């Protein structure tokens, strides 16, 4: 259904209009009307075929003369039947007032002209280019992209609307629209497979879940990668019903089959799982064992499994709320009491004014499944804590005001929720290239430190809140801090300096060294694996790389590079021991260092608000050809299973849910709709 754009109804100045036996000259901005329409305020020049005829003005196409008495005639509008004076005896009123009537007053004619303009345009343009198949395809895309139900094609109001826009479109049935959806899904899948086959680096996978109202669980797999232009992408690969009976082995096999279908086994870098330790520990181990057996995982799978950062933040937040659930109940009931009656609300506001309480927060009830709304409810309630207490003295039937001790618990809980809320917003606010893996380390180490300090806090209230949540996040930190650290080390603004600083805060100056060494060793081992792989990019002539026995390319940091003759090059094949020796000593004060050493030793890049880490690596690819390949894959690790632009404030179980309509569809149709919606967003 193409958008209709009416043709202009005003011709250019001095354009000659021919028709109906007369010629109309349009002057200035005078309006012309096509067909039987009148050229208003235009000079009418009789044509040869009309000379000598009575009433040469085209106005008489819109009026008829009616004799009303002897010598008196009136002009009757043929459109609205209004009667206008024309002549009385020998006196003639002329036609100017008749022209004004047609141009300005006759509503019937105006409505008819509007309809004719649309019909004329529609018949001369739209019908000529109308394509039933194309319109059906666009209808299917509209349904996919807007989450409309397939049975919209049967809804009377929609049918009426389509008929008014394009009467020639023959509405299709549900079966036909399903076929269109599948065709779009298969076409877009083929495009994505071709794109993934040509990306320069590895691909990381996310595994999420969707629940339904029928207690059926779907598994969603998405790929994240950085393309040749150093742009970060995430694409859904598959949405499948969880195997039944559900088991960790069955889920592992389903994921492996998906990797095989997409030819991704050899390109897989990491896999990010939702934070459900009870099952994911098992099937992540299954996946690691299977893929490590084929020798396709980097670092032998040590950094293969990553836990979802958004999930752990949600789990910790719900843990904080659980520690004060009794107080939350009292606050909810108090707000309900206040909002239930205008008199209660007015009295509440009156007390707040008397107490000179000024707050930008307004009382509101929360959505119990979204912890951020509960946090905002508690935050507002804290501002008015004195009002809640005084309100009891005015109403005998109000008895749910929190106590002083209760407010102390809420204040402590909000201290932790403030951090969690800010960190979660950081994930949601990251757009496009900015949700790279390096951005997660900062918030994670701060939260780990805060929870550690909370465990040792002298206040029983704070310690009571932290006890329930520290174990959850500590498990995440132990599993993922090395991956997080490697990622932030690939940020030239921080490198290993940020890791050293954070670890000294968390572990203390003495113990920090051994944890820093773990990260140092992991980065070096990972770099060696990339260095041992074939170089994919041409080297800059300034940086001359040589690959010794340990697989590390070395860069000569001083002096001019020598030009080797063929005989010298051949002899070089037997100098492996010498190359290894050079890697350990310096010659003539000119050390040989590999790219990783040079990168880490260089001064930190200045921190600016608009810094783009991917742009930095793109600009420095020739300087660090091997390290940039490693950085491309590391920065593409999805630390969260939640995509950009999606809400990360999840229910306590950490799962998203399908709506009732999609829950009722066949699994293959659910997959086609969800995958195609994701892919169509990026189609030209």
Swiss-Prot record:
Fetch the PANTHER family from UniProt: ZINC FINGER BED DOMAIN-CONTAINING PROTEIN 39, ZINC FINGER BED DOMAIN-CONTAINING PROTEIN 4
Listed A to Z, the keywords are: DNA-binding, Metal-binding, Nucleus, Transcription, Transcription regulation, Zinc, Zinc-finger
- According to its UniProt entry, this protein's organism is Oryza sativa subsp. japonica
Query: What GO biological process, any one, is recorded here?
Result: post-embryonic development
The protein's job, in short, is: Transposase-like protein that is essential for plant growth and development. May regulate global gene expression by recruiting other cellular factors.
**Organism taxonomic ancestry:** Eukaryota, Viridiplantae, Streptophyta, Embryophyta, Tracheophyta
Indicate whether Hydrolase appears among the record's keywords: no
Q: Where does Zn(2+) bind?
A: 77, 80, 101, 106
Q: Which InterPro entries match?
A: hAT-like_transposase_RNase-H, HATC_C_dom, RNaseH-like_sf, Znf_BED, ZnF_BED_domain_contain, Znf_C2H2_sf
Q: List the record's Gene Ontology CC terms alphabetically.
A: nucleus
Check the record and name the SMART domains matching this protein. Answer: ZnF_BED (SM00614)
Q: Provide the coiled-coil residue spans.
A: none
Instruction: List the SUPFAM superfamilies hit by this protein, alphabetically.
Output: beta-beta-alpha zinc fingers, Ribonuclease H-like
- GO terms, molecular function: DNA binding; protein dimerization activity; zinc ion binding
- A Pfam family of the record is Dimer_Tnp_hAT
Q: Where exactly are the zinc fingers annotated as BED-type? A: 54-113
Region annotation (HATC (Hobo-Ac-Tam3) domain) maps to 595-680
Q: Where in the cell is it found?
A: Nucleus
Please state what the protein is called.
Zinc finger BED domain-containing protein RICESLEEPER 4
Q: How does it assemble?
A: Homodimer.
